[in-house]
Structures are given as C-alpha cells and as structure tokens.
Amino acid sequence: MNKFDEFIESNEKDLDVDTSTRNSIISMSPVRKTGRKIRSASSNGYRLEHHRTSSAGSMHSQRLMTPTRLNDQDHPLQAKPDARRVVTRHSSVSVPNAMSKRRSLIQPMVVPTTPESQNNLPSVSHSEGSYGIPLESTTVLSSEQAMASGLRRSRNGSSQSVNSMIATTIPTNGVDVSALLQSLATKELELLECKQKIEDLKKQTQHEEQNYTRRARELHELKEQVSKHLDPSLNTPVKNRAFSPVYQNIPLESRTENAGNSSLPSSVSKPKNMGHQSTNQSRSVSPQDIQERRQRDDSSDSSKQSLWSKPLALFNQFDKIIQHEIERTLNWDDSLSGTPEVQEGTPTSNSESSAQQYDNEAPGARQKSPSQGSVSRSLWSFVSDVKAGLLGIEEENDNDVITDNRCDPVYKSDRQHEQKKSTHKITNRGQAEDSGDDSSLNTRKFKTTTKFQKDNAGNNSLTDESGHRTREKKSKRSSNKLSFIGEPDNDNSSVKNSVEMTDF
C-alpha cells in the first residue's frame, strides 16, 4: 500500500467517514492487483464501488451507484446516529433563521390596519400560544386573513370613491373640501391628457403630411424619369438637338422680341419648324408662357409705379401732340405768307412744295405707333374744325366792314389774306383748273349768294404778264344757298350764274 492510502484509511477510521462517497471521482491512489471494493457499514442503500489508480496509471476511478433496497431506514439522506447528532446540532442553530426567511417571503403586501384586522391579530397570537399550532400554519393563516382583509378594504375603498363622486356631482352643505380638491385635480389631469393627445395628433398629422409631400415629389421624379425613357425625342441624334442649348442660353426677352418682330411668312417658317418640332417639344418655351410672364412683369411694374404717373404721362403726351401740330401748322402758314407772289403765280409749285413737305414730315409720322397716329389725327381734325369755324366768323365780320366802307384797297388786302389762309385747302382738281388743264373743265366750285354779290361789287379778276386769267380764291363757309362758277367762254371774261340748291 501507498503511504497516502494508508493515511486516508486511518483518517477514515478515526472519523468514521467514508471519503470515497463524498470526495471527487478522481483519486491519486495507485492501482492494485486485485482491485479494492469498499463497502461501508453505513451504506445507505447504494452499492458504492470505487477503483483507485495510481498517479502514474492512466485509468481513473469511477463511481457506480446502483440501488439495492428501498426502505425508510435505508434512505440515502438518512445518516448514522452520530451523524444525526451533529446534523441536529447544526440544524437547531439554523432553523430560526430559515423560518424567519420563509416568513418574510410568504408575508403578503403591507396593508393599512383596520378594526377587523386588529381583532384578528390577537386571536392568531392566542392560537399560537395556547393551542400550539406550528409556525408554518400560522403564517399561512395570517397571509390568508391579510388577503381577505385587503379585498374587503378594496371593496370599501371603491364604495367610498363612488360615494365621493356622487357627492361631487350633487353638492350639499356638508361637502368635504378634500374631495372637491381631489376631483378638481382629476379633472385637470384629464384636461392635460386631452391636450397632450391633441398635440400628439397634430404632430402625427404634420409627420404624415411631410411623408405625403415627400412621396409626391418622388412620384413626380419617377414620372419624369419614365417620360425621359419613353420620349422618342431624347433618342434622336445629337445633330438635330445641337441648337437647343444655344436657344436655352438666349435670354427670354430677346427671344420674345425676335418672335414678335419676325416678318417672315408662316409658309416659310412652318417647314423649318416641322423638322425640329419634336426636339423643341420638351425644351422650347410656349408663347402662352411668354405672355403670362410678360403680364406678370407688367403687373409688377405697374404696382411699383405711383397712382399719378399714368395721368401725368397722358397729359404730357396730349400736350406734346398738340404743340407739335400747332408748330407745324404755324410754320407752314408763315412759309406760305412769306412768298405770296410765287404761290399765286405758280399753283403747281405750291402743290409740289406741299407734297415735298408731306414727304419730309412723313418719316416722323411713320415712326409713331398706330395708336399715336390715330390720336394725333383725331386731335388735329378737332383743332382744324375749331380753327375753320373761328376763321369763318372772322371773315364774315371783315367782309361786312369792307362793304360798308367801300374801300377797294382794304378789300383787296382782305382777299389776299383769305387767299393765304385757304391755299393749303386747295384740291388737286382746283389746282388743275387754275393751271388750265383740259381734264378739269367739268369741275365746278360753289359759293354763297351773298359772297357772289360782294365779288361783283369789287374787282373780281386779275391778269398776269402772259395774259392768262387768274381767279381769286375765297374759303367756303357754312350757308344754305350755293352757286357755281361756269366754264370760261373766252380768255378775257367768265360767266358767273347764281343758282339755288334746288336747281343743283
């Protein structure tokens, strides 16, 4: 035997303990030839086999436990009498602690004491002291009683809460202030909860709206991508689309001006545009968009202007038009009055000069817009009518004075003045008749009866160096009775016959 094994056996005999059943399975004892089987006198119903091996051996000991007898005395947890003594000594010390722990674990929740529970507690203690009920049974009974008392208290509390609610709904003289304050606090809490729910719902709606806008944007982008893939214009060669970036770089205003000022016929522009219609479909700017942008710009500019800017501009324009027309007429009258002899001698030259003056004034008039030209024509027609009426009144007054005084020089000067004023109103037919043209023999001039009689009283005709006949011109004013001048019978005199309007 090994010394280590001898030492273990001696200790086991002294302590009367089998270490092979309590220690680990592995042992350091050497292997014996016959193998040792230990069967303790204090076997507990199991056959214990323990094979010891040396430290040098490779075989480990293995414990085999096989039940042999099943009796209450041979129970594996039951120990020897000495062992029971030791165990009871240790258990006697640890039992109160264990019971206290069990009591703390089994004890229910602490509830406020009521008169019923206080009456139950002394009876429990009395039963414990007098009748000798074990501790475990008393703890179970106390827990059951505590649960029953808790249920009764919960019922009482619910009934009290119902009564308090009834008291709040139907106020009486003896209402408790604490109950009112409690109900007030509960109402405030309910209102706060409602507000919180409303705020949460608002936040949720905002979040949903943001999600909706984001998804709508994504949908729009997807539609654009699909349209790009399906649009055949994007699959055309680059040569057909080379002009589009240049067209995009041109400012919008210049494009609209070029579109408005284009004078090419539509038949020429259509074939050119038909080839590029598909390519410009997605990139070109439609005229409706241009008009809308112009209207927006005009509205913004008009809103920026003051309220008095338009009336002042209109008055200034009206003043300029009247001033221009009056200056033109005054300069024309001055030029005609500066050279009366030339105008009287050569009426054709007067027509040529008037035509040249019209040609010189035409470019200025052509530069005006159609609206300005129509306004100027209407204004000038009104001014000319007023002027003609004023001159007619002045002329009649002058003629009345001359007939009363019978002064030939004054009458002649008056006739010359009338000739100057009426030279710019001579028609082409009248000029042709004065020049002796054959095509104007059938033309006739109408004069009033009173003026015809005044002409007969004075010197009615003048002759020039070449012997041709010239007639003095008078402006025609408002009258009901008219007369015409007949064709000349000879070179020296002319026959003048007065007729009524009915004869004509």
Curated annotation (Swiss-Prot):
Q: Where is the composition biased (Basic residues)?
A: 470-479
Q: Where in the cell is it found?
A: Cytoplasm
Instruction: Specify residue ranges for compositional bias: Polar residues.
Output: 257-287, 332-359, 368-377, 491-504
Recite the UniProt keywords alphabetically.
Answer: Coiled coil, Cytoplasm, Phosphoprotein
At what positions is Phosphoserine found?
A: 244, 286
Coiled-coil region list: 179-231
A GO cellular component annotation here is:
cytoplasm
Where mainly found?
cytoplasm
Q: Where is the composition biased (Basic and acidic residues)?
A: 290-301, 403-421
The UniProt entry's sequence similarity note says: Belongs to the TDA11 family.
Q: What is the lineage of its organism?
A: Eukaryota, Fungi, Dikarya, Ascomycota, Saccharomycotina
Sequence segments annotated as region (Disordered): 32-62, 252-306, 332-377, 400-504
InterPro entries (alphabetical) = Tda11 (IPR031388)
**Protein name per Swiss-Prot or TrEMBL:** Topoisomerase I damage affected protein 11
Sites of Phosphothreonine modification? 236
